[in-house]
Every structure is written in structure tokens, then in C-alpha cells.
């Protein structure tokens, strides 16, 4: 599979480079520093006409706020939480207090209008990102599945808007290195990036850092205009090879005389993640007689492999190797009237995708795991007169092979009505999805009782298939009222109020990581029956545990937006209040006791209420940005059969976040050193709970960052620091084999570098 991916990439690149650029399309020089107009095929309304909260970043913002990946947007965007833990595979996303640690995300990711189908690709390094828009709240009407609470739409740099050469090299703490270079000439653009880090976390067992990482990314882009048709081909490829998973065992205190504490990272088996990702997308915009037709087509290939010491201790208990070979195809058509009426405009579209994922996820049980997880459990159910159960093997493999297919088809429409100061939006999407899974799990062992002289061979298998079909209706209604008077407009002041009601959903799926527990139960029952002992229960998990349903929500919002441009001052502020009601919320749960897997389960009902705001002020060289989010997300009805968590806080998302950044640029009258810029920022994360019961909590903490930049005629020099106060905090919590683990945040770190652009 790796060979096929590399071959495809090389052939595509060869074709890309071989394209003629003799008929060069006219290009518009872009400064890359000011606000830029989006080229998204779905943006019928401007940013100021949207009746939903939108946060926009340009290329200048990415450098100033040290935004190098989607994870760096957390906290800056109100209500958005993307904790940095595990590896690049663990792209957990929470928005407005609701999200999930695994499987389908609550916000969609679009890169140049191409939907990124698999969440394993959500954690990537920004390379020549020209603009990013984060739409908050359900975006199901236009974007469909997995956009239940928002969409991150990213646009990369194109030779259609900028011509030139860019490059940068930076070096920092933990021997971290990043270098990137790009050229945009004629119809063709090309960019490449490499990064390396020795890591920040030491594994006490090996004495080496466990989170060493290397990453490579490539992008090639070709644009062409033929008559009234624009063609845009974007090919990207990336390779990731990293360690990670610096999880620390939590030793709980007695709550009175002894406080709990974290042990160092200390595990004996390999934990790593490798990923090869290739995505080729073609955008075509055609101006026909009466309509504008846009087409977006993509082919997405993913091969990744994860090795995991699943007990994360020095004991030899059990390990997981999960590999995926995935291919997906997407197609979308969008139609808009070529000439809209004064009072009405619209857009309509159809979307479809198909995906196949071949997954192998064998779990290897080692000596300590066989004894503690299988034999001790089995012998507790065997009468003493039978003796003790023994297994011949020092280790054995529970194989799990999956063939998973998904498809989705949808049709949607949005209309925009203008009546005086009112702008009304009404939309509807019909969305259908089908999921299929074939599974084959098995294990072979030899066992005997202590009183027996010979071992008995035993084979356990668990084969079958599952399928699910869903149909979702996703309506949206919104209103925007322009309260600006003529006198306000003359003074450069704009005031708008907005309200919306919308529905969103994220897909259901299959729990592939629970099959080792199911097969353990199958083995237990099979061995016991051979001994004439019959258990009353098949165990905590069974076939019903392999499927989970889609999560849906209805969102109600009220807000306002203020802007002022006068006497060199530029002020923009917004505030939004929301109420979100969710059904079948997807929650990550762990089997009771010493289970080895994890699975997604549907909670009954939940809700989230909150207020979020943003403000930005510019005056001469001074810039101030701030954002705030206050949210209360709770279970309305959730009983897992042992405990009733109704009324408790939803875990993993803080109750509030506050972000502020101030910077000043000193312009110098010199042809050598043109300006000096300095900035500082602070992020406060509020209290969060780590589990459904709420007895484990993360206290509020503050992170401080800053940077200093010297801009010369042809290049910039910069130094930057993050977590300057050296704050100690946790980013993640989970349980394995009955033990609790945390990951702590990265320590104080610095970096410096040089960038060029000409």
C-alpha cells in the first residue's frame, strides 16, 4: 500500500510539473498581510452578512499569534478546545462544551473546499495557509455530516492571487527544527515543509524521549482559465513518523491525609504513529448562460499505523498494532444564479462520497497480561476442586480484521431574502448515509487445569457483519437585522443583530477497539464450558456494543456585531448567546473493571448553554485582540446502568476560556530595518472535569506567550516563547486496565528563525 501511494504521488507530481504554463492566466498580487476575499464555492454571503459567529484568520495572523496547526486555534477561537496530547492521530475536538475523544468530530474540516473525510488527518502543519474561517454552531445545511457544531474552512495560497517566493527556517527547544519553501510563478505553485523535534517527555523505562517526531509535507497547485471556466488542481501529500503517548499513571490519595500524585512516564513497549496521506482535489468554476456551476472532486488516500503499549506500565501486559489502508472519493456540485434578484439569492448543491477502510488491529497479550487479565479472572470462577487454569503460551495474539465501507449522498438548498434592513436565510439539507462493517476476530491458545497432564487446544473466533442506514433532515433559519442609521454610517459605525435556529448531526459508526474484550469474553465462556462450568453472563461487552448511533443537536442563537472605522481606528466586536440540545451524545466509555478496550456509547440527552464574545482593535501600530467563552454543558439524561450522571458536567471541556493578545509595531524610516514588532498573549482555561462522575478535575490555569520580530527589506528575524510561566497542567485523562492516566502539557519553550518573501 505504501508503494502504491508513493507511486501515485510521484506520477501526479510528474504530471503536475509537466503542465504547460505558457498561457499564463492574469494574477492579482496579494500582499498576504491584509484581509483577503475568500474563494470558497459556498460563500454566497460576505462575512458581515453571516447570521452566525465567524472567526477569520489571514496569513499575517498565523505568524503573529504563532498558529502552526489547528490545535493552536484552541482558546483563541471562543468555545473551541483541541487538546494537545497523544500523537497526530488523536485529534480530539470540543466546541461549546460538546465533543468526543474518538471517532467522528463535531466540526468539519475543509481545505480548499475539499472535505477531509477522516479525522486522523485533522492534525496537520499549516503550510502557506492564506485564510482560515471558523464557523461556529451547526453548519449541517451546507456542510452536512460531522459539522454539528462548526466548520473550519482553510484556503491555501494560490498562484492565482500571489506570485513570488517564500521561505522560512526556525529552531527551538527540544532540538525542534522547521523549514519550508514555496514558489508561485505563472500558473503553478509548489510548497514543501520539513519539521523535526527531539520531544519534551522522557520515558523513564528507556531513558529516552518518547515523543520524537519527523514530518514532511508537499503541495503542488495548478490554476488555469479557459474561457469562462476556472480550473484549480491541488495535490498535497504528507508523511508523519512520531512517538508520543507520554501518559503518566495517577496514584490516587486517600482524600484526607495523602494527596494523589502522578508517576513519571514509564512503559516498556513501543508506542508510535506513522501516517502517509495523499489528497488530490480539482475545483472547476464555470460561468454558464444563467447560472454559475462549481464542481469539487477529490481523491483521498490514507495509510497509517499505530503501535501502542496499552497498559502504559513497565509490565508486559498487552500491546496493540492498528493499521489502516483507506481510500475515499468525494464529489460536490454547487449551482448559483448568475444574476440574482435585488431581494433574493440562492445556492443549491448535491454531495456524495464513498470510502473504504481496510483495518487490522491485532492485540498481543503478554505474560503479565495473560496472568492478570485472563487467568486471575478465570480462576475466580472455577471451583477449587478443579484446580487452577493454566495457559501454555507466554504470549498470544487476538487478531481483528475489519472491512469498513461508508457512503453518503445529500442534496441541499439555501435561499437569501432581503427586505429593507432584514436579511433572512432559510435552508434545508436531506442527508443519507450507509455504513457497513465486516469483521473477523480470533485467537488460538492451549490450556489445561493444574491437575491435568496435557494441554487442550482451543480456538475462539468472532465473525460477522454489521450495517446501519441513516436519514437526516437538516433545516436552518436565520435573520440578520442592520440597526445602523444613516448618521451611524457617516461616522463609520455599523451595528447588526442576528438570530438563528439550526440542526446538525455527526455520524454513527462501529467500535473496532472493543473486539479484544468481546473475544476475551468468548474465550472465557468457551474454556469454562469445556470444563463443564457455565457462566451466567457473556460479559460487559457483546455484539450490541459494536455499533453506536448518530448524534444530533438543535442550536438556538442570539447575537450582535459592532464595527467602527474612524480616524485611523478600527474596532470589531461581537457577542453570541446559544442554547444547544443534543440527543444520543457520543461518549467514550471503558469496560467496567480491567477491560482492555474502549468504545463509543450514546448518552440519552445533553445540553450546552453559553455566551461567547470577540473584540479586535487596531490603531496605528497598536493591535489588541481578545475573546471569551463561558459555557455550561451537562447531561440531561444519562444512566450507564451503574450510575445516573444526569445533571453532571460533560467531561473534557473547560467551563470557560479567556484569551487576550496585545502587540505594537514600530515603523522605522530605514531601507534596512523597516519595523520592529512585539506582542504578548495570555490564555486562561477554566475548570474542567475529567470523568462523568465529576470527582476528577483540572483546576484553572494560565498560559503566557510572546514574540519579537525584526522586519528587514528582504527578510524577517523573530524569536518567540510559549508557556513562559512554566505552568504545569494536564491535557488528557483516560483509564486502562482499571488504572487512571494523565498527560501533562508541554513545558516552557522558545524558538527563533528567519523568513523571506520576494
Regions found by a protein language model. Name each.
Residues 181, 185, 283, 287, ...:
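Membrane-embedded beta-barrel scaffold of Gram-negative outer-membrane proteins
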Residues 73, 92-97, 110, 134, ...:
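N-terminal periplasmic accessory domains that precede
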Residues 161-162, 170, 182-269, 302-315, ...:
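Periplasmic-side early beta-strands and strand-to-turn transitions of outer-membrane beta-barrels
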Residues 112-136:
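Short acidic/polar hinge/loop motifs at secondary-structure boundaries
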Residues 505, 620, 682-691, 709-758:
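C-terminal beta-signal and adjacent terminal beta-strands/loops
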Residues 20-61:
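Short, acidic, small-residue-rich periplasmic hinge/interaction motif at the N-terminus
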Residues 343-347, 418-424, 432, 567-582, ...:
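Gram-negative outer-membrane beta-barrel transporters
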Residues 71-114:
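Extracytoplasmic beta-strand/coil segments of soluble accessory domains associated
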Amino acid at each position: 500500500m505504501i508503494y502504491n501511494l508513493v507511486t501515485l504521488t510521484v506520477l501526479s507530481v510528474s504530471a503536475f510539473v509537466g503542465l504547460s504554463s505558457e498561457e499564463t492566466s492574469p494574477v492579482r498580487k496579494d500582499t498576504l498581510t491584509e484581509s483577503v476575499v475568500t474563494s470558497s464555492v459556498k460563500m454566497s454571503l460576505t462575512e458581515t452578512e453571516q447570521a452566525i459567529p465567524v472567526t477569520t484568520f489571514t496569513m499575517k495572523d498565523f505568524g503573529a499569534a504563532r498558529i502552526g496547526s489547528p490545535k493552536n486555534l484552541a482558546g483563541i477561537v471562543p468555545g473551541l478546545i483541541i487538546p494537545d496530547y497523544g500523537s497526530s492521530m488523536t485529534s480530539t475536538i470540543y466546541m461549546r462544551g460538546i465533543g468526543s475523544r474518538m471517532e467522528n468530530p463535531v466540526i468539519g474540516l475543509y481545505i480548499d473546499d475539499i472535505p477531509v473525510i477522516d479525522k486522523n488527518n485533522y492534525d496537520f502543519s499549516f503550510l502557506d495557509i492564506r485564510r482560515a474561517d471558523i464557523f461556529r454552531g451547526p453548519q449541517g445545511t451546507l456542510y452536512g455530516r460531522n459539522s454539528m457544531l462548526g466548520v473550519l474552512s482553510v484556503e491555501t495560497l494560490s498562484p492565482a492571487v500571489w506570485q513570488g517566493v517564500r521561505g522560512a527556517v526556525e529552531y527551538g527547544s527540544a532540538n525542534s527544527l522547521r523549514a519550508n519553501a514555496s514558489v508561485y510563478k505563472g500558473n503553478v505553485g509548489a510548497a514543501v515543509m520539513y519539521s523535526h523535534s527531539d520531544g519534551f517527555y522522557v520515558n523513564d523505562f528507556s531513558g529516552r524521549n518518547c515523543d520524537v517526531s519527523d514530518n514532511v509535507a508537499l503541495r503542488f497547485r495548478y490554476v488555469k482559465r479557459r474561457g469562462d471556466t476556472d480550473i484549480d488542481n491541488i495535490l498535497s501529500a504528507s508523511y508523519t513518523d512520531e512517538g508520543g503517548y507520554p501518559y503518566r499513571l495517577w496514584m490516587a490519595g486517600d482524600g484526607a491525609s495523602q494527596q494523589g500524585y502522578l508517576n513519571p512516564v514509564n512503559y516498556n513497549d513501543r508506542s508510535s504513529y506513522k501516517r502517509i496521506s495523499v489528497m488530490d482535489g480539482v475545483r472547476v468554476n464555470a460561468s454558464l448562460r444563467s447560472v454559475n456551476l462549481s464542481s469539487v472532486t477529490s481523491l483521498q488516500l490514507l495509510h497509517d499505523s499505530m503501535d501502542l503499549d496499552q497498559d502504559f506500565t513497565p509490565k508486559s501486559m498487552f500491546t496493540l498494532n492498528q493499521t489502516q489502508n483507506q481510500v475515499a472519493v468525494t464529489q460536490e456540485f454547487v449551482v448559483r444564479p448568475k444574476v440574482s434578484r435585488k431581494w433574493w439569492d440562492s445556492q443549491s448543491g448535491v454531495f456524495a462520497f464513498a470510502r473504504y477502510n481496510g483495518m487490522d488491529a491485532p492485540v498481543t497479550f503478554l505474560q503479565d497480561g495473560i496472568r492478570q487479565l485472563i487467568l486471575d479472572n478465570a480462576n475466580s470462577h472455577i471451583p477449587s476442586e478443579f484446580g487452577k487454569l493454566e495457559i501454555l503460551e507466554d504470549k498470544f495474539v487476538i487478531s481483528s480484521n475489519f472491512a469498513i465501507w461508508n457512503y453518503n449522498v445529500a442534496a441541499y438548498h439555501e435561499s437569501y431574502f432581503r427586505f429593507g434592513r432584514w436579511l433572512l436565510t432559510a435552508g434545508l439539507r436531506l442527508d443519507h448515509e450507509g455504513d457497513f462493517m465486516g469483521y473477523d476476530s480470533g485467537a488460538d491458545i492451549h490450556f489445561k487445569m493444574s491437575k491435568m497432564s496435557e494441554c487442550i487446544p482451543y480456538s475462539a473466533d468472532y465473525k460477522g457483519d454489521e450495517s446501519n442506514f441513516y436519514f437526516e433532515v437538516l433545516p436552518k433559519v436565520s435573520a440578520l437585522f442592520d440597526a445602523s442609521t444613516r448618521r451611524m454610517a457617516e461616522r463609520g459605525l455599523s451595528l447588526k443583530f442576528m438570530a438563528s435556529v439550526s440542526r446538525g448531526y455527526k455520524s454513527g459508526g462501529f467500535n473496532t477497539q472493543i473486539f479484544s474484550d468481546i473475544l476475551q469474553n468468548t474465550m472465557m465462556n468457551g474454556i469454562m464450558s469445556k470444563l463443564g462450568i457455565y457462566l451466567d453472563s457473556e460479559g460487559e461487552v457483546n455484539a450490541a456494543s459494536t455499533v453506536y448511533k448518530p448524534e444530533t443537536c438543535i442550536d438556538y442563537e442570539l447575537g450582535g456585531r459592532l464595527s467602527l472605522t474612524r480616524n485611523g481606528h478600527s474596532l470589531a466586536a461581537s457577542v453570541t448567546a446559544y442554547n444547544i440540545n443534543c440527543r444520543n451524545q457520543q461518549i467514550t466509555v471503558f469496560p467496567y473493571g480491567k477491560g482492555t478496550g474502549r468504545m463509543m456509547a450514546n448518552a440519552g440527552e445533553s445540553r450546552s448553554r453559553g455566551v461567547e464574545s470577540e473584540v479586535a482593535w487596531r490603531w496605528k501600530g497598536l493591535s489588541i485582540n481578545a475573546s471569551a467563552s463561558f459555557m455550561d454543558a451537562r447531561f440531561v439524561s444519562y444512566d450507564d446502568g451503574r450510575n445516573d450522571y444526569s445533571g453532571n458536567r460533560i467531561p473534557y471541556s473547560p467551563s470557560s476560556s479567556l484569551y487576550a493578545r496585545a502587540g505594537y509595531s514600530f515603523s522605522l524610516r530605514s531601507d534596512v530595518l523597516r519595523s520592529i514588532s512585539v506582542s504578548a498573549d495570555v490564555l486562561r482555561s477554566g475548570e474542567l472535569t475529567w470523568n462523568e462522575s465529576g470527582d476528577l478535575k483540572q483546576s484553572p490555569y494560565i498560559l503566557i506567550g510572546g514574540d519579537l520580530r525584526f522586519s528587514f527589506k528582504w527578510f524577517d528575524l523573530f524569536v518567540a516563547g510559549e508557556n513562559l510561566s512554566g505552568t504545569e497542567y494536564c491535557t488528557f485523562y483516560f483509564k486502562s486496565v482499571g488504572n487512571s492516566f494523565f498527560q501533562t502539557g508541554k513545558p516552557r519553550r522558545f524558538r527563533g528563525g528567519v523568513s523571506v518573501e520576494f
